[in-house]
Amino acid sequence: MVNMEDNYRRGTVFIQGEPAGIIEETDEGYRFTYDPEYCEKEGAVAASLTLPLRTRSYFSEVLFPFFDGLIPEGWLLHMTQEIWKLDRRDRFGVLLSACRDCIGDVSIIKEE
């Protein structure tokens, strides 16, 4: 039997260079889950004030505003979409492609 969750696009979320969780696209929207081991680490910090540390998953019908805010804007967004041939309406695809090396503490690496 095929696990449908294996077909979801997802990325590992890194905070200050440490793997901290997974963001994924689901049939209902988006899910973000912190890694339980990360949550237990002394000094672990949340990705955002709107996504405090917890082991239960967060769900949203639209891309979480914090993650959407990591996506480049203006000419850089246009260049990203042109170079990687991304659909401009696919915000999650842009997030997974362009946010590997963001300014700040959070980055996302697409899982293959």
Language model: regions and residue ranges:
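Phosphate/dinucleotide-binding and metal-coordinating scaffold of catalytic cores
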Residues: M1-E112
